[in-house]
Amino acid sequence: MNTPNINQIKSFFLSLQDEICQQLEQIDGKEKFTEQCWQREEGGGGRSRIMKEGTIFEQAGANFSHVSGDMLPLSATAHRPELVGRHYQAMGVSLVIHPLNPYIPTSHANVRFFIAEKEGEAPVWWFGGGFDLTPYYGFKEDAIHWHTTARNICRPYGEDVYPKYKEWCDNYFYIKHRNEARGIGGLFYDDLNTPDFEHCFNFTQDIGKGFLSAYLPIVEKRKEILWGERERQFQLYRRGRYVEFNLVWDRGTLFGLQSGGRTESILMSMPPLARWEHDYHPEPESAEAALYTDFLPAKNWI
């Protein structure tokens, strides 16, 4: 089967958003997600959910959007001139979690589907997505667990899938103007449309459903670690890098803003607090320095 079933995809994305929100509420134990539904004049809309000031999660956002239109933004057609003049639909779930405890990493996950159609021609469609981890204080066993889970999700689809999408993730979440990675990576894929729709949809479902099994054990393991002002200040400083990447380099942010998406939802990925410090350097041999030497440089964790 190679004809995309848009209703089937939408149904999965909505149920995935529900499942992720329920599990995050359960582990936080205090706060609930609030929901805002929105419509877009050009076509489509979405539902944005956000949790604020939880016991564990300082802010967590989970967005579903399904937008359509007759003219793609420049961020989408720059590399694909064949899409000019096609009606399009873009749909996906995006998740960004900013914990309060600096020993718990920030995490991001996304699964998405895109289709562009023109009368008399075959539709152009693909899936994309992945997940990545941004620690402030690194733990080798967490990195190994994260990447082992990612590899196990990919393995049924071929032994070459994990290394390929891990490398893509390392390259994508790289802050070029800082010459450093945003975090320790994970998986990133895009333009997935072979061998057929069913294969690509199954893989995307496994990525979406597998994210929490990669992330929540790390949250559980680190949530009781005591922290103070030093750790908090370093966390806020590193969050500044997260902001820089999302506003300067992230294609999803650019696509959303250029296509007239809901700005509040697009910028939900921003941390509630961040800071900058001119010419900061961590103390040699410190836990903060270890992030730069032992965790941010791309490596094979497993």
Curated annotation (Swiss-Prot):
Presence of keyword Metal-binding: yes
Pfam family, one: Coprogen_oxidas
Protein location: Cytoplasm
Transmembrane segments: none
Signal peptide: none
GO CC list: cytoplasm
Binding site for a divalent metal cation: 98, 108, 147, 177
One Gene Ontology term of the molecular function aspect: metal ion binding
EC number: 1.3.3.3
PANTHER family membership: COPROPORPHYRINOGEN III OXIDASE, MITOCHONDRIAL (PTHR10755), OXYGEN-DEPENDENT COPROPORPHYRINOGEN-III OXIDASE, MITOCHONDRIAL (PTHR10755:SF0)
NCBIfam families: PRK05330.1
Function: Involved in the heme biosynthesis. Catalyzes the aerobic oxidative decarboxylation of propionate groups of rings A and B of coproporphyrinogen-III to yield the vinyl groups in protoporphyrinogen-IX.
Name this protein carries in UniProt: Oxygen-dependent coproporphyrinogen-III oxidase
